[in-house]
Each structure stands twice: as structure tokens, then as C-alpha cells.
């Protein structure tokens, strides 16, 4: 079942905003960070239809709010539609998001799919629902993006999510990878964007409190947060308390990769290093030896 979507024609998003100086300072910071992310990774272009995935949590509310404000002032034209996947979790307040969208004149869909029952059936006893749930959720949302003609799918992951995913893969997956700010989905049909990539979680928490978003808890399914991710999140929070610049440095490292300083042979051709070494022209014997190797290689061709 889909809720009717209002047209972006005559778009009139003018919510009641806080008036405190703290709010406007934070808003300015978030706008700047989101704007830089959009520009740096070419996330949104003229004519795009951006599908914003809204769960009812602080991250997706903040993402939607900032993008809607950008739409009002952006020098390009793009459309926004909010989409919520109602997974039929017990106790899910079905009226909260429709009311919020309608009160703020936001075009939206409510996509109803009982992925909760499927998740319960497929999850082994004693395991958390998160892995299966997220796969089913992604599949449903990505397919729906195709149905409505969305050119970009906006997700609410922030800087700390990206860093946490990096450490999850490092500690438990044996790989150096995180969440890219922009990604082509595995089926090659959707462009995923994360406009909050430069935003810290603590700023999102403050912003959501100031804006008084009607937050829907994410643990309605009764499952506990993935233990490994929970431990890493706590580690990151402790680091941020003790060493305020550490997370900034880690995120910077994700943007400053040197393949030649790692050990991945698919990223760097270590076999050609000998041929790239500068010759010592002061040593005639060494020069003759190197030239003989080059001549032999040409003769072989």
C-alpha cells in the first residue's frame, strides 16, 4: 500500500523553526557540511528526483530537513520525495510519519511490506535481526526507487557510521572498507548518496532535540543492537571524549589512501617497482646490466 504523494509543484516546506542562537549556529554548521559533501561527491544534479529514506529516527529526519531547506535555496532544480518502509513491526506507530509529512507539506510514500515476519523466520535463534532486516529493507527500498523513477536514493548515515563500519570491517571482516558517500548499488540500478557523510552524530542528536522531531524508536522488533557494532560505537565515543580530534583524523585518513603503502596487489602493481627504479649512471656495470635487460625484453616482443 502506498500513501498518495503530493506533487513538488508549488513546493511549500516552511516548518516552524526554533529561534535560539544555538539552533541557528548548528543549522549553519550542518548546512555547510552537507553542502560540501554534495559538492565534493557530486551527489545531487539538476533535474534529479531524490528519494529520501525516512525511518523515523534522528538521522533520517535531519537528512530530510536539511535537504528540504537546500531545495528552497539551491541554484539547481531537483525534487524530493520521502519514503518510509513500514515493516509491520509490532507497536510501530503508523500515524506518526504521515502526520509529520502532511503537517510540513512534504511529498511522501508509505511502503508497506511485512519484512518483520520474514526476518524472524530467517534469523537463527540467538542472533540479532539486524543483518537480515537491513538486507530486506534495502531490497524493498531500492526496488521502489525504480518504480517511482528516483534518480538518487539518499540515506541517513553520518560520519560516525562511516568510521564505525570501517572498524567493523577492519576488526571482524579482514578488509579496509567503510561506507562511501556515493555508491552505485550492487544491481547497478540505483545511485546511493549519504549527504550527512561529514556530519558528527552528536550534532545530529542536538539538532533533532532542537527541532523536536517525533522520533520513532528503532528497537521495536525487540532485537538488541549488533554487539560488535555497539562495542565499536562505544569505543568511538570514548575516543571522542578523550581525544576530540581523533575521529576527525580517522575520517580524513579515509580520504587520503596510499595504495603503495598497503599490501593489496590488486590496487598496486608491486612487480613493476624494479623496472621503475632510477639507474645509478655513475656505475657503468650497473648501467650495462640494466640496458641488457631492457634489450632482452624488446627482443622478446
Swiss-Prot record:
Cellular component GO terms, alphabetical: cytoplasm
Species the sequence originates in: Acinetobacter baumannii (strain ATCC 17978 / DSM 105126 / CIP 53.77 / LMG 1025 / NCDC KC755 / 5377)
Motif PP-loop motif: chain residues: 55-60
Protein name, per record: tRNA-cytidine(32) 2-sulfurtransferase
Pathway named in the protein's UniProt entry: tRNA modification
Co-factor remark: Binds 1 [4Fe-4S] cluster per subunit. The cluster is chelated by three Cys residues, the fourth Fe has a free coordination site that may bind a sulfur atom transferred from the persulfide of IscS.
N-terminal signal peptide: none
Keyword annotations of the record: 4Fe-4S, ATP-binding, Cytoplasm, Iron, Iron-sulfur, Magnesium, Metal-binding, Nucleotide-binding, RNA-binding, Transferase, tRNA processing, tRNA-binding
Cofactor or coenzyme needed: Mg(2+); [4Fe-4S] cluster
Role noted for this protein: Catalyzes the ATP-dependent 2-thiolation of cytidine in position 32 of tRNA, to form 2-thiocytidine (s(2)C32). The sulfur atoms are provided by the cysteine/cysteine desulfurase (IscS) system.
Family under the similarity heading: Belongs to the TtcA family.
Binding partners and assembly: Homodimer.
GO molecular function: 4 iron, 4 sulfur cluster binding; ATP binding; magnesium ion binding; sulfurtransferase activity; tRNA binding
Amino acid at each position: 500500500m502506498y500513501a498518495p504523494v503530493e506533487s513538488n509543484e508549488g513546493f511549500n516546506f516552511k516548518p516552524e523553526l526554533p529561534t535560539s542562537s544555538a539552533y541557528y549556529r548548528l543549522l549553519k554548521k550542518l548546512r555547510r557540511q552537507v553542502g560540501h559533501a554534495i559538492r565534493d561527491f557530486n551527489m545531487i544534479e539538476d533535474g534529479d528526483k531524490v528519494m529520501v529514506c525516512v525511518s523515523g529516527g534522528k538521522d533520517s529526519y535531519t537528512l530530510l530537513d536539511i535537504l528540504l531547506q537546500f531545495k528552497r535555496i539551491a541554484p539547481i532544480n531537483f525534487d524530493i520525495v520521502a519514503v518510509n518502509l513500514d515493516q509491520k513491526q509490532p507497536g510501530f506507530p503508523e500515524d506518526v510519519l504521515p502526520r509529520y509529512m502532511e503537517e510540513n507539506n512534504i511529498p511522501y510514500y508509505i511502503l508497506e511490506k511485512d519484512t518483520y515476519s520474514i526476518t524472524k523466520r530467517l534469523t537463527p535463534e540467538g542472533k540479532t535481526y539486524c543483518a537480515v532486516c537491513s538486507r530486506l529493507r534495502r531490497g524493498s527500498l531500492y526496488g521502489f526507487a525504480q518504480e517511482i523513477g528516483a534518480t538518487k536514493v539518499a540515506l541517513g548515515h553520518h560520519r560516525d557510521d562511516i568510521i564505525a563500519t570501517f572498524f567493523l570491517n577492519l576488526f571482524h571482516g579482514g578488509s579496509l572498507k567503510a561506507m562511501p558517500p556515493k555508491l552505485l548499488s550492487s544491481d547497478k540500478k540505483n545511485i546511493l548518496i549519504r549527504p550527512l557523510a561529514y556530519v558528527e552524530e552528536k550534532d545530529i542528536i542536538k539538532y533533532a532535540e532542537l527541532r523536536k522531531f517525533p522520533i520513532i524508536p528503532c528497537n521495536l522488533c525487540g532485537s538488541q543492537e549488533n554487539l560488535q557494532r555497539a562495542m565499536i560505537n562505544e569505543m568511538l565515543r570514548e575516543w571522542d571524549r578523550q581525544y576530540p580530534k581523533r575521529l576527525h583524523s580517522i575520517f580524513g585518513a579515509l580520504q587520503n589512501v596510499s595504495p603503495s603503502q598497503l599490501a593489496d596487489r590488486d590496487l598496486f602493481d608491486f612487480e613493476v617497482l624494479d623496472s621503475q627504479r632510477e639507474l645509478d649512471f655513475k656505475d657503468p656495470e650497473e648501467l650495462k646490466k640494466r640496458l641488457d635487460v631492457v634489450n632482452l625484453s624488446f627482443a622478446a616482443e
